Design a protein with these regions (language model features):
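Aromatic-lined substrate-binding rim segments of carbohydrate-active enzymes
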Residues: 384-430, 520-526, 532-535
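Substrate-binding clefts and catalytic carboxylate motifs of secreted carbohydrate-active enzymes
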Residues: 26-29, 33-46, 192, 199-206, ...
């Protein structure tokens, strides 16, 4: 018993010593208050947070997302704001040799005071700020104050001082009362805060990411980089580069890397000098479990623990790593240059969307929102998201979820559709921003490529910006800006990627194929906007080629239940109403453009609610057409990322999911279009052609069934054949003369149903022989029944005639597992829905809408 007590006492002392030796953190998120700098009234504040959300919480402004309220809050960005808190530093923290104050994010121009002494001045929303504060901290109460300067007042003098203009095409300066003074280019701040063609102008400020005190004794791990030199099925060679801060010289430090449960361990012993030390621990892993995108395999993650011990000081850090090799293959071929990603030696067709921030007020984006956003991408078979350059480098949780779900990330640097003053202090600020974020994100297996910007290269060379001042007699201004442009995107940013994430591809701009020119379809990536912006017909998606489509899109409105959330008044329910025009930022013509396309491709909607539904079907059909065309064009084309996955506020936009998280038709249509096997019927030159597309790593064998039906279910022709398809290949598996298939039936009265069955799973698709507006859609008798399930109900629909785009809704947040689907005559379709509605409520609220009803 006595020995047991001695052992327990010794264990306790060891644990206590280890705890005392390890770094500690004290979060500073409590008891904040804020005020307008020129006024004296203090109000409670939330940290992390923003000025706008704090003003809303204190009922000083109304929700700017509701109706026209955005207009009434434009004064906020012209004011300075002060945030303040008082705190007591813990005794354990105060006992540490080094103590730093760390702000993970300050938006944007701020002075920080601790106990009335200025300790920090910031000018970049995207950087982490840390400063030594031990000498200033007191036992008892301490005062921390952050003075936020108006980004407008800081940057207007910069704009006024220049004889030339830096362009920023999406900056909604007029909405902010600044006329044409687009000052967003001067701030290292999220560009979309100043407005975009899908977002409001809400230029906010605040402590937008966590703030804390960090104290440590002796040593601290400041960074760990798992540099993967070689990853194959047989072995993985990894150099673990550990950065250690040491207060004083340490003659002997042991640095250890382990993967508990995986049988992986390695260590080195080294002396440490005062300051920053870099130590490398080599790992050699036999038969590694590699990380794959979700359709190619398992996205396996190792949990590595890096620890350092020197005397009585120690620190450790845990990092989840996916072992994989990834290349961006850009090889000269006879008809251009390839542009494809290769994962673990396998060519990968990128399927996904462009991602924008989930809110203008970023601290409101919870983990649950991130989870739904990424899960919704995975649910429709996406394997890549492009983090667009006008937003932010996302929170860690975003990349962690992509790692877990097997989704690659195309990561833009935060520059978009603008030209920036890239010289001097600005450029050094950008360099530090790049280093900060590359270091933070480089261990994520999901990071596939760093891209210099969004559309800046196109803007400078393709939109005429590079010759504007030459035409005005001042070519020297164009030369100045061109030099700055080249320095930022062709020197500073690629040098940062090479230095801090060697081996990760860098792409100068999106779209891009060469420096002095816009993108070419035979090389690089393409933003294809002739459909929509240039009013080209949707059918043009079938004939336009590119190596990689990194943007294309089509607009729609949110559904009716979503519209009611931000526009509940009946007078708003018109696409030309003031509210609907305010919640459309794609130009004053954009709502009319949806209507024009609708009337060109379908027919006029009879009322507002019908218009919303039809806009979904129109958008879904358009993007489905594009995705299938891109996939049929493999191996010329290797990527299809539509614009866009999400919204940052309630708005008519190109998003496949609205701001409330409701799926539009486009999102449902993306699931089969992005599946690992696609059967794709199309018509051209009087022939029906059926293509089979595989993204699988193995040969596929199965049965293809092609059936031509009349709308009442009468079979006009049927063909069944066995098909073998090589790995990662495309094959035309059926071709027939359309006239021979229809047997005299009008093209508008028939459909083609294609089904491919392999391994017990069926892949199907429906095609048409006539444009949608020429389809002779019949009146149909739809019947439905519902059976209770653990989550809600399973709803089964049947119809005596073909039904186009059946949409099930409950006018709530309920999500149907499938929707906007075509019903074949006499063939039942069962879909599940999660809901807590009683059976009586469900029966009363269920609404079934289909295209036949809209004429």
């Amino acid at each position: 018993m006595k020995n047991l007590k001695q052992i327990l006492t010794a264990m306790y002392l060891c644990m206590a010593l280890a705890a005392a030796a390890s770094p500690v953190r004290q979060r500073l998120h409590d008891d904040w208050q804020f005020r307008q700098a020129r006024l004296n009234n203090w109000y409670p504040a939330t940290v992390p947070g923003t000025v706008h959300t704090d003003l809303m919480a204190n009922r000083i402004i109304e929700d700017p997302y509701f109706r026209l309220n955005e207009r009434g809050v434009q004064w906020v960005d012209k004011e300075d704001w002060i945030y303040e808190t008082h705190f007591e530093a813990g005794a354990d923290l105060l006992a540490r040799e080094r103590i730093e104050l760390v702000f993970e994010g300050l938006d944007t121009y701020a002075d920080v005071y601790l106990n009335d002494e200025k300790i920090l001045t910031t000018d970049n929303m995207f950087r982490r700020w840390r400063t030594e504060v031990k000498r200033l901290l007191r036992p008892g109460e301490n005062a921390l104050k952050v003075y936020f300067h108006s980004p407008i007042k800081v940057d207007l003098p910069k704009y006024d001082s220049l004889p030339y203009r830096y362009e920023a095409i999406n900056d909604q300066s007029a909405n902010g009362g600044l006329f044409d003074k687009r000052v967003s280019v001067f701030a290292r701040k999220a560009g979309y805060h100043y407005g975009w063609d899908w977002g409001p102008r809400l230029v906010t400020s605040g402590i937008w990411r966590p703030v804390y005190l960090e104290g440590w004794n002796g040593i601290r791990i400041s960074d760990v980089f798992y540099r993967q030199e070689e990853v194959t099925a047989e072995r993985a060679r990894v150099q673990v580069e550990v950065e250690i801060d040491a207060v004083r010289e340490q003659p002997r430090a042991v640095v250890t890397v382990t993967a508990p449960g995986e049988g992986i361990e390695a260590s080195v012993t080294t002396p440490l000098r005062p300051g920053v030390n870099r130590v490398t621990v080599p790992l050699d892993i036999a038969s590694p479990k590699r990380w794959w995108t979700r359709e190619l395999g398992e996205p396996h993650l190792y949990e590595f623990r890096t620890s350092v011990a020197a005397g009585d000081a120690s620190d450790s850090r845990t990092t989840r790593i996916g072992l994989r090799s990834l290349r961006l293959v850009r090889e000269k071929v006879s008809d251009g240059t390839t542009f494809r990603f290769e994962l673990n030696g396998e060519p990968l067709f990128a399927k996904g969307a462009n991602y924008i921030p989930c809110d203008v007020f970023l601290p409101r984006v919870t983990r649950a929102v991130y989870e739904k956003t990424i899960d919704d991408a995975a649910a429709v078979n996406m394997n890549m998201l492009r983090v667009w350059g006008g937003g932010v480098y996302e929170d860690d949780v975003f990349y962690e979820l992509c790692d877990e779900r097997g989704i690659l990330v195309w990561q833009d640097f935060m520059f978009a559709c603008s030209i920036y003053p890239a010289e001097g202090a600005w450029l050094e600020n950008v360099r530090l921003e790049a280093e900060d974020n590359i270091r933070r994100l480089r261990n994520h297996p999901s990071i596939a490529v760093w891209c210099g910007n969004n559309e800046c290269n196109d803007a400078w060379f393709g939109w005429g910006w590079n010759a504007r001042y030459t035409k005005q007699g001042h070519p020297e201004y164009d030369k100045i800006i061109d030099t700055q442009f080249k320095r930022q995107y062709y020197e500073v940013l690629p040098e940062a990627v090479a230095a801090f994430s060697p081996g990760t591809p860098y792409h100068p701009s999106s779209p891009w194929s060469c420096y002095e020119g816009t993108s070419e379809n035979s090389e690089g990536d393409t933003h294809f906007w002739k459909v929509w912006h240039s009013r080209a017909p949707i059918a043009d998606y079938n004939t336009t080629r590119s190596r990689f489509f990194s943007e294309y899109g089509f607009q729609s409105f949110p559904e009716y239940a979503s519209v009611l959330r931000f526009a509940p008044e009946e007078r708003d329910w018109d696409i030309e109403s003031e509210v609907m025009m305010a919640h459309q930022r794609g130009g004053s013509f954009a709502n009319m453009r949806i209507r024009q396309y609708l009337e060109d491709e379908y027919w006029p909607a009879r009322d507002f609610r019908t218009f919303l539904y039809m806009s979904h079907v129109l958008q879904g059909d358009a993007i489905k057409t594009a995705i299938e065309a891109h996939r049929r064009d493999k191996p010329y084309c290797w990527g299809s990322l539509f614009w866009q996955h999400n919204d940052c506020w309630p708005v008519a936009s190109w998003a496949s999911r609205d701001w409330y998280g409701r799926w539009k038709a486009q999102h449902y249509f993306a699931r089969p279009a992005f599946d690992d096997l696609l059967v794709s019927p199309c018509t051209a030159n009087g022939r029906l052609e059926v293509f089979l597309v595989s993204d699988r790593r193995e040969t596929v064998r199965g049965k293809l069934e092609t059936t031509v039906l009349k709308m009442d279910g009468t079979v006009l022709s049927k063909n069944t054949r066995s098909v073998t398809l090589a790995p990662n290949a495309v094959r035309k598996v059926h071709s027939a003369d359309i006239a021979g298939l229809l047997h005299g039936c009008s093209p508008g009265e028939a459909i083609v149903v294609t089904k491919f069955t392999t391994g017990g799973r069926r892949y199907s698709n429906i095609g048409y022989f006539a444009p949608q507006k020429e389809l002779a859609l019949p009146e149909a008798d739809i019947r439905w029944s519902a059976e209770p399930t653990a989550e809600g109900y399973a709803v089964t629909l049947t119809s005596d005639r073909f039904v186009r785009a059946a949409w099930l809704s409950l006018d709530g947040n309920e999500h149907f597992e499938d929707n906007y689907f075509d019903l074949l005559p006499g063939v039942g379709r069962t879909v599940g829905v999660s809901t807590k509605l009683s059976r009586d409520e469900f029966d009363r609220l269920l609404r079934i809408t289909h295209l036949q009803q809209t004429r």
